[in-house]
């Protein structure tokens, strides 16, 4: 898509989140800074109805409960019926059995269009050996690009692996995004924010691989710009919101660092 940010800001898509309690505020604000409209409806009594009026659904399993899983399944079924994109952020997969089982339940019960996680989380979902510490990636034994491509094929979903370099694949096309700054890893929530941004971009671009690639390029570019005037994590977070708010398609497209394999 030529001008995704302009499209988001003109159409103001509603992006429904069922996300974790640690970063919910950050996800809402970054979605709004990009120009989309965030809504966070977790109750099983209303979540499917909220999805029914939304343009994308973002699921984040960072703070799981059994009731939250029920809401996620209800909303994902509604999203599938409406044919809007479903993004699953597989936070902490590999850390506990419950988390692994619930991620597998979601993937086995509903259509997930975009599966996002760090290197360890995606490797675990793909059946590869991986080490994780809580929700942080430590190491994987396989090549990330190969893991993303093969898992995309087997899951029939777009797979997004985030890290120092982000890998995005739909099984046919594979992109490596090199935008970003190390300060993005110094604050809690940038991974969750990335899922919100991916949902926002996917809400206006039916090519979900392209949408995910663009989302990470734009977010990474904002991180690079924010870092220029930041003394540390505190000022960086404030500057990040400002840089996102002031982004333009022309500015980011001149900064894109993306390789198609």
From Swiss-Prot:
Substrate binds at residues 40, 189. It comes from Methanosarcina mazei (strain ATCC BAA-159 / DSM 3647 / Goe1 / Go1 / JCM 11833 / OCM 88) (Methanosarcina frisia). Coiled coil: none annotated. The keyword Magnesium applies. NCBIfam families: PRK09355.1, thiM. Belongs to the Thz kinase family. Its EC number is 2.7.1.50. This is Hydroxyethylthiazole kinase. GO terms for biological process: thiamine biosynthetic process; thiamine diphosphate biosynthetic process.
């Amino acid at each position: 898509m030529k001008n995704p940010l302009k499209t988001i800001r003109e159409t103001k898509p509603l992006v429904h989140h069922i996300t974790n309690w640690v970063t919910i505020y950050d996800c809402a604000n970054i979605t709004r800074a990009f120009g989309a409209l965030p809504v966070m409806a977790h109750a099983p009594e209303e979540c499917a109805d909220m999805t029914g009026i939304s343009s994308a659904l973002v699921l984040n399993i960072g703070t799981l409960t059994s009731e939250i899983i029920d809401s996620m399944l209800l909303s994902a079924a509604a999203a599938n019926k409406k044919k809007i994109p479903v993004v699953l952020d597989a936070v902490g997969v590999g850390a506990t059995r419950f988390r692994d089982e619930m991620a597998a339940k979601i993937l086995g019960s509903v259509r997930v269009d975009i599966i996002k996680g760090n290197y360890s989380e995606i490797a675990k979902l793909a059946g590869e050996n991986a080490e994780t510490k809580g929700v942080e990636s430590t190491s994987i034994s396989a090549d990330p690009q190969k893991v993303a491509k093969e898992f995309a094929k087997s899951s029939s979903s777009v797979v997004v692996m985030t890290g120092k370099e982000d890998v995005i694949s739909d099984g046919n096309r594979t992109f490596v995004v090199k935008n970003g700054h190390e300060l993005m890893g110094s604050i809690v929530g940038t991974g969750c924010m990335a899922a919100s941004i991916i949902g926002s971009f996917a809400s206006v671009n039916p090519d979900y691989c392209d949408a995910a690639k663009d989302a990470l390029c734009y977010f990474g570019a904002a991180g690079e710009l924010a870092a220029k005037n930041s003394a540390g994590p505190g000022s960086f977070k404030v500057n990040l919101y400002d840089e996102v708010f002031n982004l333009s398609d022309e500015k980011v497209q001149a900064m894109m660092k993306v390789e198609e394999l």
